[in-house]
Regions:
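Generic cytosolic/nucleocytoplasmic N-terminal low-complexity/intrinsically disordered segments
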Residues: 4, 22-25
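Conserved ATP-binding subdomain of kinase catalytic cores across diverse folds
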Residues: 179, 212-355
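Short, compositionally stereotyped local motifs that mark structural "simplifiers"
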Residues: 24-228, 234-236, 241-245, 252-255
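Bacterial N-terminal signal peptides that target proteins for export
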Residues: 1-8
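C-terminal motif of bacterial Sec signal peptides marking the signal peptidase cleavage site
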Residues: 17-20
C-alpha cells in the first residue's frame, strides 16, 4: 500500500496574502563566515525575554521575513532584542487586500470593479508570533548563512484556542509550522506566487473584451500567478516545525526549503495550499523527521522519517466546509491495497501571522 504525505490546515483562514520572488536556480551568495548563534531556540516562552545574538562578524537581523543580507529593512544588531507578546500589532501579510489573491468576487463586480466578498481582518483578529532572521558580515563583506527562529510568548492556549481539547482527542501533539519568506515572493505582481498578479491582469483584459461573462466568479477559471507550476515558480522559504500541546512545544525541524502553491481549482481560494521541497540548493535534500510517526511505514515495516516533499493542504474543494472530507475517506481506505494519503491537522503561521 502506498501512502502520500499531507498536512491539513487545522483552521479556517481569517484573511491573508503572500508574495513571491527568487527562483529555484538562485545562486548562494553566503560563505563560511561564522553563522549567528541565538541565545534561545525557537519555541514557546511564558514571558517576554531579551534575545542575544553572537557571531564573529557584524550581525544584521530582520523581523519581517526578509533575508537580512539582502533586505533594506535589516537592522544592525547592537544589543539584546526584546521578544514580547505581539497581540494587536499591525498586520502585514494579513493586511494585503484579498482582492489581490482571491477571485471570490461580488456578483456586482461587473459594474463596480472587482470587489472581494471577504475583507482583510483587523489587527486584533490575527494571532502573531515573532520571527527573527539573522546573518553576519565579515570585514571583507562576506555574509554567513541566514539563521531563523520563531518564538511564541505566553501559553499555547493563548495562541491556539482549543489546543488542549484537540491534543486530548487525538492523543497526539498538534503540528504547527511557521513559514518565513520574502514578502515579494508571495505578493509582488510580477513574481509573487500567492497573487493573481500580472498573469491574471493580462488574461482578464482579454476576458472582459469578449463581453460574454455572466458572473464575477467566472474569473476563477482565468490564468494567474498562483496557477503557474514548475521550478520557475518555486520560491525560497524557511520552516520551523513544532509539535505543540498545552504544555509547550518541541522544535523538530528548522530548515530552509522551496515552496510552491499546491492544488488545482483551489488555487483561486483565499487560503491556498503549499507544497514544500527539500533540496541541496537550500541546504538539506530531505526533511528528516517522522512527521507521521508509526502511521507511515515502508514495505519492510520501517517508520518513514525522511521526505523530499510534503503538502500543507488547505482543504481543497472542502475548504469552505469541513476541510476534512478527503482525510476521512482516505482513512476508510487505509486497509485496502491501493494508494492513500496520510494526513494530520496543522496550524500555519506566515511571516509571524496566523494564516
Amino acid at each position: 500500500m502506498r501512502t502520500r504525505k499531507i498536512l491539513t490546515f487545522a483552521a479556517i483562514v481569517l484573511a491573508a496574502v503572500v508574495s513571491g520572488c527568487s527562483n529555484g536556480n538562485k545562486q548562494d551568495t553566503h560563505t563560511d563566515t561564522s553563522e549567528v548563534v541565538f541565545s534561545r531556540q525557537g519555541g514557546i516562552y511564558n514571558e517576554e525575554f531579551e534575545l542575544e545574538l553572537t557571531s564573529k562578524g557584524a550581525i544584521y537581523y530582520t523581523t519581517d521575513g526578509s533575508d537580512p543580507s539582502e533586505s533594506d529593512t535589516s537592522i544592525k544588531y547592537d544589543g539584546e532584542i526584546k521578544v514580547a507578546d505581539r497581540s494587536g500589532d499591525a498586520n502585514i501579510v494579513s493586511a494585503v487586500s484579498p482582492t489581490l489573491f482571491c477571485t471570490n468576487f461580488s456578483d456586482y463586480s461587473k459594474d463596480d470593479g472587482l470587489i472581494c466578498r471577504i475583507d482583510a481582518p483587523s489587527d486584533d483578529a490575527v494571532d502573531k508570533c515573532t520571527v527573527i532572521r539573522a546573518a553576519a558580515k565579515d570585514s571583507a563583506g562576506n555574509w554567513s548563512a541566514v539563521t531563523t527562529q520563531t518564538y511564541f510568548i505566553g501559553s499555547m492556549t493563548d495562541h491556539i484556542d482549543g489546543i488542549e481539547a484537540n491534543c486530548k482527542a487525538s492523543g497526539s501533539a498538534l503540528a504547527v509550522i511557521s513559514i518565513t519568506m520574502d514578502y515579494d515572493d508571495l505578493f509582488d505582481s510580477e513574481k509573487g506566487i500567492y497573487v493573481k498578479g500580472d498573469v491574471f491582469d493580462n488574461a482578464f483584459e482579454k476576458f472582459i473584451g469578449n463581453k460574454n461573462w455572466i458572473k464575477a466568479d467566472d474569473t476563477r477559471k482565468l490564468d494567474a500567478n498562483y496557477s503557474q507550476r514548475g521550478r520557475e515558480w518555486e520560491r525560497e522559504a524557511h520552516i520551523d516545525f513544532f509539535e505543540m500541546n498545552e504544555n509547550g512545544a518541541d522544535q523538530v525541524l528548522n530548515q530552509d526549503c522551496g515552496i510552491r502553491i499546491q492544488g488545482n481549482y483551489s488555487r483561486s481560494d483565499l487560503q491556498k495550499g503549499f507544497r514544500l521541497y527539500a533540496r541541496k540548493d537550500y541546504g538539506d535534500n530531505k526533511f528528516r523527521y517522522d512527521i507521521w510517526g508509526d502511521e507511515l511505514k515502508d514495505k519492510d515495516g520501517n517508520t518513514i522519517d525522511k521526505f523530499k516533499t510534503f503538502v500543507l493542504r488547505a482543504g481543497g474543494n472542502c475548504a469552505f466546509t469541513s476541510k476534512y472530507n478527503d482525510t476521512y475517506w482516505q482513512t476508510l481506505a487505509a486497509g485496502v491495497d491501493c494508494s492513500t494519503k496520510a494526513s494530520r491537522p496543522c496550524v500555519v503561521y506566515l511571516n509571524g501571522e496566523y494564516w
